[in-house]
């Protein structure tokens, strides 16, 4: 989503992080941003993005070079003009998917809430193998055999990565774990044709027993 009850999501919470990676609905090729309310947090973030430098001869923390370069910023300004058009096209694709897949036994789509305005970044489908008759992985393989890439967003869970082994309790996120084992994100981008959406859905539904 990018708006809730008419407010941009950057207005909620202490801070909101945005990715502007090339795969996002709005991108600057690479980069991101943080929105914040507390001026002290803003000063701290500014220092951390600039190697942790606090003053001419003072470094308070280990920081990074997280400043956006001018080329990426210029690309963002160019893309900003087209973001509404991009979202509208993505919405049409998502609605076409829903025409085919909504109400199918064993498929769960994200709930559309009236007070939320989506940016249609992804189209995730949660598969119930017992009801649908095929697992998420089997459907993904069938799509791949037809030259269609689908992603297991997001699998595996971050707290199951080997680098975090023993640091986080995997059992503390049972809902996320349940969904991660069953979710498949179907292709969604502004220039995806309705014919291709129909073909993707046909292949998905052909796996149903």
Model features per residue range: what roles?
Residues 11-47, 70:
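Active-site PLP attachment segment
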Residues 8:
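Conserved catalytic cysteine-centered active-site region
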């Amino acid at each position: 989503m990018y708006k809730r009850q008419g407010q941009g999501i950057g207005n909620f919470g202490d801070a909101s992080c945005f990715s502007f990676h090339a795969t996002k609905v709005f991108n600057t090729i690479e980069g991101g941003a943080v929105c914040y309310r507390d001026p002290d947090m803003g000063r701290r973030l500014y220092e951390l993005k600039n190697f942790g430098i606090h003053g001419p001869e003072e470094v308070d923390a280990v920081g990074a070079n997280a400043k956006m370069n001018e080329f990426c910023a210029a690309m963002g300004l160019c893309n900003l003009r087209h973001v509404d058009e991009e979202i509208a096209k993505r919405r049409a694709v998502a609605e076409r998917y829903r025409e085919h897949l909504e109400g199918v036994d064993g498929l769960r789509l994200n709930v559309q809430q009236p007070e939320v305005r989506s940016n249609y970044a992804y189209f995730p489908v949660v598969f119930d193998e017992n009801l649908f008759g095929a697992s998420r992985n089997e459907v993904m393989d069938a799509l791949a055999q037809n030259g269609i890439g689908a992603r297991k967003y997001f699998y595996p869970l971050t707290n199951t990565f080997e680098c975090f082994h023993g640091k986080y309790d995997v059992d503390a996120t049972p809902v996320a774990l349940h969904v991660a084992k069953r979710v498949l994100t179907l292709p969604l981008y502004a220039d995806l044709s309705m014919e291709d959406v129909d073909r993707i859905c046909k292949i998905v539904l052909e796996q149903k027993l």
